[in-house]
Every structure is written in C-alpha cells, then in structure tokens.
Amino acid sequence: MNDSCDITFKEKVNIFSFEYLKCIIFIISFDDDDEYVFTKKLYSKLVTTSRILEDFLDFHGAKKNKDWVFYREIAATIQHLALACYSQRHVLNRLMFYSFESDQQETFKKEAFDTLKIIQKSIKLAGSVALEEARRLDISVPDRGYDISFFPGISSDQQLDHNIDDFNARDKQKENLTRIATEFLEVVKEFDQFAFYERYDLKKIYELVPQHINEVSIRRYEMLIHNIQSSFDSYVVNDESSSQNLMLEQLRSHFSIVFHILQVLGRLLHFYERHLYDTGYKDVYKNVSISLSYLLDPNVLLDRAVNFCLFYAWKFLSSGKALASRILNENMETSIIEVTIPKDRGFHSRPSLLVAKIVQHYGGEVKMVVNSDVFDAASVLDIQWAGGKIIKEEIENVQFKGDVRALEDLKILASVNYGEDHMGKGIPLPKELSYLS
C-alpha cells in the first residue's frame, strides 16, 4: 500500500475539493430565472464529490475546527439536498411509467416539480457560499465548471424490447403475493397515524417535527417499504398480459413512489434536525446553523417535508390499500373450519374483539358462517350480531371460512375458550397469539 502521508493537508484538500468545486461552478453559472432542471447525473456527481470531501474533512477534525467547520457543513448540506433531489428527480422521470388508478397525478406532478425547484435553488445558494469559503481558506478553485454535455438526462429516443419471458410456478407466486400484500397492508395500517386531509400550518408543523415526525421514524418506514419492494422484485414475476398483471404493476408503482418520497422526506428531516434545529449548541455551531438557514428557509423546508412528502406518502399508501387487499384475497390459501362457540357467555365483547383482531392481523377476508347466515369476521359488530342469532337459535358450533393463516389462529383461540374462563374473566393466551396482547 502506498504511503501518501507525505502529502500535506493543504495539498489534499485541493485534490478532494477540485471536482466538487467544478460542479459548484457549473451549477451557479445558471441565472435564477433559468429553466434548466438538474439531471440525475449532476445530482449524483454532487453527492459523490461532496461526500468524499466531507469524509476527508471529518477525518482531519474539521467539525471541531472553527476555521473549517463551515466549509464542511456546506459540503454536508449540498450532499443531503442533492440526495433528496436525486430521489425527487427519479420520481418525476418515472411518473409516466407508474400505473395508478389515481386522478390526482397531474396535481402531484406539479407539486413535485415545484418542490424540486425549491431544493435546487437552495443547492445553488449553498454552492455560492461554498466557493466563498474555498477562497477564504485559500483552496484552489478550478478555472471553469463542467460543460453541460457532461450531465445529460437519462431519457432517449427509444425503449428496449421486453423479450425476457419469466414465469414463476403459480402456487409459489400466490404464496409470495400473499406474504407481500400482507406486509404492505401492515405498513399502511401503521402509517395511518400520520394521516391528514388538510395542509398543516407552520404552528402545527413545528409541534410535530421533530417530536412526532423525525428522521428516525421516517427511515424505518423507508426501510420497510424498500424491503417489500425488494421482495416483490425478487419473488414476483409478471408472467403475461392479464388483469392480474395490471394489478401487480399498480401495486409495485405504489411501493416505488412511496419509497422514493420517503427518501426525500428523510433527507429533508435529516438536514433540518442535524443542521437547523436548535439543540442547545452555542457560539460557533449556533452561527453555522443560522448561516445555513439562509440557504434553505426552515419554514419552507418543513412545509415541503410535511405538506408534500408526508402527505403524498400517506396518500399513495392509502390508495394502494384496496388494491393490496384484492391481490391478497385472490392469492391467499383458503379453507374452512368448524369450532365451538365461547362457553357460557357466547360472543360478547372480548371473544368478538379477539376474533376480529386475528382476522385484521392477517388482512385476508374471513367470513363467519352461522347456519345459512354469513358475517364479516373482521367486524366486532358483525360478530356480536351473529352472537345474538347463536343465542336465539341455541347454536353450539360455527364455521369460519377464508384466509387459512387466520383460521389456524382461530382454532387455537377456540381451543382456549376465546381467552376467558367460565366466569368471563380473561386468561393468558397461547404464545402463538401473543400479537393480540
């Protein structure tokens, strides 16, 4: 391994800054009213050059040095804003290929483009400051920026033919779709805590961020959606042109767009929490934070994070719920079981709630059959209606038909008298039903 320690810090900072500053010179060459939208290749170059510069500066302790900390923070700012823009640009590039049943695509497209331009403008402002800092620190600045031809867009005048015919065994395909649709519905259910129907004002946003909405919580959902999409791409194959094939394309579109929106949201929240949010630091760090707030107004940043990113992430998750439920019900393994009713007290509140929670946990359709009448086993109210019929007609056994996964757990629940003793008091449930606790 070559030992390069004989190269001074001063010489190395020039090396690690060169391509970064060359990008900066290119992006600030455009007037504010210029309609040029940065390409993914440009964002990628900004990300890689700013990241390696930030790593270099961190290695040499720039975060603890009052002369170098601001140059380092500007590089980190450009990196995270460029990452957000890369994901946002990806969404806009792919929007025509997404398959949605939504009628709000044009509204989303306009808001997405406006948000991209806002962040792009902030990168330009940060770039100007980066150049000033480079000159203050006597860093060599390139004579010129890159030529615009170095950053072409990704589209061209043709699409390659789809000539690979993959096919999964139908039984395996059904199993995979059942699992993936269930996981998606679980995320939708959990993410529903963030649901809102009217745009938040700034007062409400500052109450939510970062106490309730923050980078850590959003990164978790980003990873969950990414795992579902990865599983879909690995184990589900669109085998032919059919109605189900269209549904699968629509489902994957929901995975993809939500994943990339959450990427943007995560980067914006990271920038706010790490660089703008007042965590009690004083003096140098406080001054750095104030300086960065001039590059991207915290009010604007949080408005876009919440009223654009969070809103549309929830919107696209919600619009995929019915589709995922349909795919689940068409592909899940089904069966029918017959079990006894709860002894002594019948289907009152506790047994009805436990039955409904089991069905809701798996997400697939399950019906409760009482003689010739059919009830929704996911509905506590429906089960209690059935309970009245059971008492009136002195019925001792009922049937459940539908999602075999839920039926297995319903058999376990019935075997312990639906979680209560003969007096109607709750008893411990088997470990297989621990998710009901």
What are these regions (language model features)?
Residues E393-K401:
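Beta-strand/loop-dominated core regions that host nucleotide or nucleotide-derived cofactor-binding catalytic loops
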Residues R345-Y362, D373-E393, A406-Y418:
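Amphipathic alpha-helical interaction surfaces in cytosolic regulatory modules
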Residues A406-K425, P430-S437:
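C-terminal basic regulatory modules in eukaryotic proteins
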